[in-house]
Design a protein with these regions (language model features):
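Short cationic amphipathic helices and targeting signals
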Residues: 125-136, 551-560
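Short alpha-helix capping/helix-loop boundary micro-motifs
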Residues: 2-5, 119, 425-429
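Functional cores that coordinate and move charged inorganic groups
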Residues: 66-81, 88-92, 140-147
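Intein/HINT protein-splicing elements and their conserved insertion hotspots or analogous self-processing inserts
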Residues: 9, 15-18, 22-63, 68-69, ...
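A glycine-rich phosphate/pyrophosphate-binding beta-strand-loop-alpha-helix module
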Residues: 1, 28, 42-47, 319-396
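Short helix-loop-beta junction
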Residues: 97-102, 304, 521-525, 682-698
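An acidic, glycine-rich "communication" segment
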Residues: 341, 785-821
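N-terminal beta1-alpha1 cap of cysteine-dependent amidohydrolase-like domains
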Residues: 596-762, 766-778, 786-797, 801
């Protein structure tokens, strides 16, 4: 909503509020410490710089902000700023300066969990999940009521002043009323009805000043930093001798390299479906393998538009050429993003995360080269902007090893995130190959035949073949984006071919080269491949290892054989004919074969290549989780003939079964019940609204305060989310808040005893209801939730079969097999 985007100016007398978690001795110097080499600072600062998170508090703060935004023009928030690097010392002055006002800040009002914090620690710590915001004095009580409902800590810590001066200390604001209550949250909520004001002359009994200075001192024009750095001598890495390598061994080693291998062990431990708007996560196809190029979310529950996000990084190349590494990072972000239907290139926005070992000899010069290459050359050529980003300039660590001082230095690193609106999320392309159409795979290589191997995964897999040293054969020319116009042409080619119905699948070429891209498509689809190296339109051939394992930018697309001519014509019209090569054909045999003309160069069993690709995930899961579960998953995943997820419905999903019951216009009322930290109430409410219910947002604090009564509803749904901790058994905290309050216990018991009402528990809400079985008729034998066999949180699609059940939710669905997250 555009009116909610622009900040309004604070007026003198407006309250300055801290919303969110309490201050603690964490992240002290976190943002600053990210620009201090590890080992340079004191041990105490190193420990204090460690960041810790509290997602439940973040959820509570976000709910307060959402409730304010929902008021539209009546939103009480005039301006808001997140608390990041520098803590309150940065956030509050910026909030005031943006409005051209000063402020008086009372550190004694800042919520804190550590009473020993000094003024500097209280002002500068970077405890997370906090915001600072400005609100008119007349609306502080209204804002306090929202915070109380969401059980979110907040405090009025100051007041805006007409004089552009920052005054910080203790005893500067009027004290809260004597009956304000105690406790951390009580203090945070106390005193909001008394307009804070500066003590006279900022001095007097009980007043302690820590800061008193003009805002210009903070926001004037400081002198620009000047740094001198010289380019170091080019690194003398040995260059890979591909003539000495055996193709079959190379394929196995590259797929087992951590940069290429499957990352399922990192993905299944995180919830990817919360919010109900995920259209594309990492896992692709019936076998749910992590090969997606980008993430796509829906922009709402009632349409097909959405947003796409992708990432690009090629940090190892910076050891050879920092500018090339940066250009390749931008290019990879775009080639990943192309899988989604973005209407035009100018809708793409980038975020740049720069990292470097600033001050280390030569690294400042490399950083300058990389920033110049992207910011002043490549992005202007692509007509792309980088409106946001961040940096960490301390990418080096000092330590002692056997009494000898050592230093570890990371190369200049650029991680690019690309974002764009999506016109129709259903038109996305994935690496999943279509099996029902005779097709071929085309490589569009933006190197236009160049096969630079410097810094490649293949080079990292082999020592110098000439002397057998441990040093990888990492050298040679690094791949690069030589012509930005080719990247623009690839974007437009894929967009036009998609609209013409010429593409069935898409995957970018990156780490591991086209061989890795092709294998990932084969793994995701449980198909074999016949890879041919003689498919260039002009008859070009080359060194098989360089063709297969160079990591120049590019993409592989699946094209129906019957559309070959139309696609080739489109390639030519976009000026990419010298970049295009027919490189493979899908097969149903469990074999991946590489040939040139009529000669077979290498052949692998599908399972052998899959085992190599899965090896990192398998090893990590065996170390972290239950080894037996890791072994079982590998055995299941590596079966070429595994059926995968095969959904089956025994009912018509388009039938509106509620229509006959709603013909009178009376919609049953359902309470969407949530507790602090719950995060799935919106999609739950939408689901019931679409099913014909009137959904009401009911917080547990509403039941405690008597604002709602379950007796007024036909049903309630206890929603999911990390209330009282995102751990097994967290629902016990929610249940205890009911069982230990007689009024709530009686309310829930009476509701469960009704014959004309229903209840549903989801995720944490299900755990909560399991703890209420003592007041639920017929629930005496309900099972308890136990730790799973893998001993790890598992976020996977499970194929569930619906049995015969008296549940009104499952009536008429028996025999259906449905993937459930």
């Amino acid at each position: 909503d555009r009116p909610m985007v622009a900040k309004r100016s604070l007026q003198p007398g407006d309250a300055v509020i801290v919303l969110g978690g309490p201050a603690m001795l964490i992240g002290l110097g976190g943002g600053a410490a990210s620009s201090v080499a590890s080992g340079d600072a004191s041990e105490d600062l190193d420990f204090a710089s460690v960041q810790r998170d509290n997602p439940e508090m973040e959820r509570r703060a976000q709910e307060v902000i959402d409730r304010c935004v929902a008021l539209a023009d009546a939103n009480p928030i005039q301006s808001i700023h997140d608390v990041g690097a520098g803590g309150l010392s940065n956030a509050i002055p910026e909030l005031l300066h943006d409005s051209g006002v000063g402020g008086v800040i009372d550190l004694g009002k800042v919520p804190k969990d550590d009473p020993s914090l000094s003024p500097m620690q209280l002002w500068c710590n970077e405890s997370q999940e906090r915001y600072v915001l400005g609100i008119p004095q007349a609306r502080v009580d209204e804002f306090a009521a929202l915070c109380e409902r969401e059980r979110c800590v907040f405090a009025v810590v100051g007041v805006a002043t007409a004089e552009e001066r920052l005054v910080v200390g203790y005893g500067l604001l009027a004290p809260p009323p004597a009956n304000a209550g105690g406790g951390r949250e009580g203090v945070a909520l106390a005193g909001h009805s008394t307009p804070p004001h500066p003590s006279p002359a900022h001095a007097g009994e009980g007043v302690e000043l820590a800061i008193d200075l003009p805002m210009d001192v903070l926001f004037g024009k400081p002198p620009k930093m000047h740094r001198d750095s010289a380019h170091p001598a080019p690194p003398q890495w040995p260059e890979a001798d591909t003539d000495a390598l055996e193709l079959r061994d190379a394929g196995l080693r590259v797929l087992a390299h951590p940069s290429v291998a499957a990352k399922s062990f990192l993905i299944t431990i995180g919830d990817r479906s919360v919010g109900g708007l995920t259209a594309r996560d990492q896992m692709v196809g019936p076998w749910q393998l992590p090969v997606a190029d980008c993430a796509i979310t829906l922009s709402g529950f009632d349409g097909v538009t959405g947003e796409v996000m992708s990432i690009g990084e090629r940090t190892p190349l910076a050891l050879l050429d920092a500018a090339a590494s940066a250009r390749m990072a931008v290019g990879e972000a775009i080639t990943n993003l192309i899988a989604a239907p973005v209407a035009s290139r100018d809708r793409i926005k980038l975020s740049a995360n720069w990292m470097a070992a600033a001050g280390h000899p030569g690294e400042d010069a490399r950083l300058f080269d990389a920033v110049k290459a992207v910011g002043m050359e490549l992005c202007p050529a692509l007509e792309l902007s980088i409106p946001v980003g961040k940096d960490s300039l301390s990418m080096q660590a000092q330590y002692q090893a056997d009494g000898v001082a050592q230093k570890s230095v990371s190369p200049v690193s650029l991680v690019v995130s690309a974002f764009a609106p999506v016109v129709d999320v259903r038109a996305r392309l994935t690496p999943l190959l279509r099996r029902d159409v005779e097709s071929e795979l085309w490589l569009i290589g933006l190197g236009a035949g160049r096969q630079r191997m410097g810094g490649s995964t293949l080079a990292q897999c082999f020592p110098d073949a000439n002397d057998g040293a441990a040093l990888p054969a990492f050298g040679g020319d690094a791949p690069d984006l030589d012509d930005p116009q080719r990247l623009r042409a690839l974007f437009e080619l894929v967009r036009d071919a998609r609209e013409d119905g010429l593409l069935l699948a898409y995957h970018d070429r990156s780490d591991g080269g086209v061989f890795a891209a092709l294998c990932e498509m084969a793994f995701a689809s449980h198909l074999g491949l016949d890879i041919r190296l003689d498919g260039w339109g002009d008859g070009r051939t080359g060194d098989p290892l360089r063709v297969l394992f160079n990591e120049e930018l590019g993409a592989v697309v699946q094209v129906p054989v019957e559309d070959r001519a139309a696609f080739a014509d489109l390639v030519a019209r976009h000026g990419l004919i010298e970049c295009a090569q027919r490189i493979a054909r899908p097969t149903t045999a469990p074999v991946i074969r590489v040939s040139d003309e009529d000669e077979t160069l290498a052949e692998w069993r599908w399972e052998d290549l899959f085992d190599a690709w899965w090896s990192v995930t398998h090893a990590m899961q065996r170390l972290r989780d239950n080894p037996a579960c890791a072994d079982s998953e590998r055995e299941s995943a590596r079966r070429f003939d595994a059926p995968g997820l095969q959904p089956k419905l025994t009912f018509d999903a388009s039938e509106d079964i509620a229509a006959p019951y709603l013909s009178t216009g009376a919609r049953p009322k359902v309470a969407i019940l949530r507790e602090q930290g719950v995060n799935s109430q919106i999609e739950t409410a939408v689901a019931f609204d679409l099913a014909g219910f009137d959904a009401f947002d009911v917080h547990m604090s509403d039941l405690v305060a008597g604002r709602f009564d379950l007796a007024d509803f036909n049903g309630f749904v206890a929603c999911g989310g990390f209330s009282y901790g995102d751990v097994l058994g967290a629902g016990r905290g929610w249940a205890t808040s009911i069982l230990e309050r007689n009024a709530l216990r009686d309310m829930f018991a009476a509701f469960f005893a009704r014959q004309d009402a229903f209840s549903l528990g989801i995720c944490n809400g299900c755990q909560m209801m399991a703890q209420l079985r003592g007041i639920i008729p017929g629930a005496e034998h309900w099972p308890t939730f136990q730790r799973n066999a893998s001993e790890q949180y598992e976020a996977r699609l499970a194929l569930l079969e619906v049995g015969e059940s008296p549940s009104l939710f499952l009536r008429g669905m028996a025999g259906s097999r449905i993937p459930v997250a």
